[in-house]
Amino acid sequence: MKILFVLISILYAVYRFSSEEDVDSAYLANELEPVEDINSEQYAALEPKEEQERSCAGMGQDCKDDCDCCLNIATCNCWFGRYFCSCTFGDYQTCLRKKGKCKRNRPQSCPRSNLNRKKG
């Protein structure tokens, strides 16, 4: 009984292996048509779109002046005069300066730290 079971298993494995080779070789020889994806239109909407240019620069991004930086307290810090400029953290005075100077990305309010207030 065990021998019969092993023999049938071997014959089935040989049959499956040979039929897969026929399908693979027919597909490689272009005898079979590839299966079309009926949901391809559905996934077309999920493709990433090109990123549009932002009106302001985030922290660490390139800038030309303080008005290019997004955050209220962000300042445009330049190395060697006007070269290699990027947005970095500023302070309360930076925010006040941006409020008076900038037409776009103007801060609505300037955050003030609670560290220097006297209690008591």
UniProtKB/Swiss-Prot annotation:
<comment type="similarity">
    <text>Belongs to the neurotoxin 05 (agouti) family.</text>
</comment>
<feature type="disulfide bond">
    <location>
        <begin position="69"/>
        <end position="87"/>
    </location>
</feature>
<feature type="disulfide bond">
    <location>
        <begin position="56"/>
        <end position="70"/>
    </location>
</feature>
<dbReference type="GO" id="GO:0090729">
    <property type="term" value="F:toxin activity"/>
</dbReference>
<feature type="disulfide bond">
    <location>
        <begin position="63"/>
        <end position="76"/>
    </location>
</feature>
<dbReference type="GO" id="GO:0005576">
    <property type="term" value="C:extracellular region"/>
</dbReference>
<keyword id="KW-0732">Signal</keyword>
<keyword id="KW-0964">Secreted</keyword>
<keyword id="KW-0960">Knottin</keyword>
<feature type="signal peptide">
    <location>
        <begin position="1"/>
        <end position="19"/>
    </location>
</feature>
<feature type="propeptide">
    <location>
        <begin position="20"/>
        <end position="54"/>
    </location>
</feature>
<feature type="disulfide bond">
    <location>
        <begin position="78"/>
        <end position="85"/>
    </location>
</feature>
<keyword id="KW-0800">Toxin</keyword>
<keyword id="KW-1015">Disulfide bond</keyword>
<feature type="domain" description="Agouti">
    <location>
        <begin position="56"/>
        <end position="95"/>
    </location>
</feature>
<protein>
    <recommendedName>
        <fullName>U13-lycotoxin-Ls1f</fullName>
    </recommendedName>
</protein>
